A protein has these predicted regions:
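Ser/Thr-centric signal marking residues that sit
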Residues: 28, 65-66, 102
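Acidic/histidine-rich helix-loop elements
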Residues: 32, 57-65, 93-97, 179
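Bacterial N-terminal signal peptides
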Residues: 1-9
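Alpha-helical cap/lid subdomain in secreted, periplasmic
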Residues: 52, 70-208
């Protein structure tokens, strides 16, 4: 614990260190996991081991929707934030919100970031077929379209690396008992998948 606190403190005092806000829901927060095993700490360690000097700020809130993220954004954007990774939309999907609602909220988030000169990356969410093919297409298209419109770094979904290639279903061995949230191994798989994109995003900030 002492070592962990020292490392965090060392990161915090580096004036020239890039600081990234991870704006998301329970997946970002690290729901159901020990703090060290959550997405943000594991990604922090992955980036550090891959020669990327960055401090990740955990802005994940369990159950948060795109509207909740939008409402929290302003006070989370402290002057030292250099970039934001937006990973919202999963709870909109679970609640069956109209894709237009989700898109509008995300547009407001990225417009606000753009107006402040803050670069962003977006992690998409892929809809199942439960709501029908038209809903799925409209929802799935939101994220790549926004990435193109706002020039965002883009990851298609946290869950892509959790899919078993043989069954084409998410592997239950990578999920917690609730069948929704990733376990420790699931988080490791997610970080290995998204890490290179986030690394490139951070590298782009140093070139601005």
């Amino acid at each position: 614990m002492i070592i962990s606190l020292f490392v965090v403190s060392s990161f915090a005092i580096a004036d020239n260190q890039v600081k990234i806000l991870m704006l998301g829901d329970s997946l970002t927060q690290g729901y159901g996991l020990e703090e060290k095993s959550g997405l943000v700490p594991v990604l922090q360690r992955w980036l550090s081991s891959n020669e990327t000097d960055v401090l990740l700020i955990n802005g994940g809130v369990s159950g948060d929707t795109t509207l909740g993220g939008l409402e929290r954004l302003d006070w989370l954007l402290t002057p030292d934030i250099d970039g934001v990774v937006v990973a919202l939309g999963g709870n909109d999907l679970l609640r069956g919100f109209n894709p237009v609602f989700t898109k509008n909220n995300l547009e407001k988030i990225f417009t606000q970031l753009e107006s402040k000169g803050i670069s962003a990356a977006v992690v998409g969410t892929i809809s199942p077929l439960n709501y029908g093919p038209e809903f799925k297409k409209e929802f799935d298209d939101i994220f790549p379209a926004l990435a193109k419109e706002y020039g965002l770094f883009y990851v298609d979904s946290f869950f892509v690396p959790l899919v078993d290639k043989q069954t084409q279903q998410i592997s239950i061995n990578l999920l917690q008992n609730d069948g929704i949230h990733p376990n420790d191994k699931g988080v490791e798989a997610i970080v290995a998948y998204i890490g290179p994109v986030i690394k490139d995003f951070i590298k782009s900030l140093s070139q601005l």
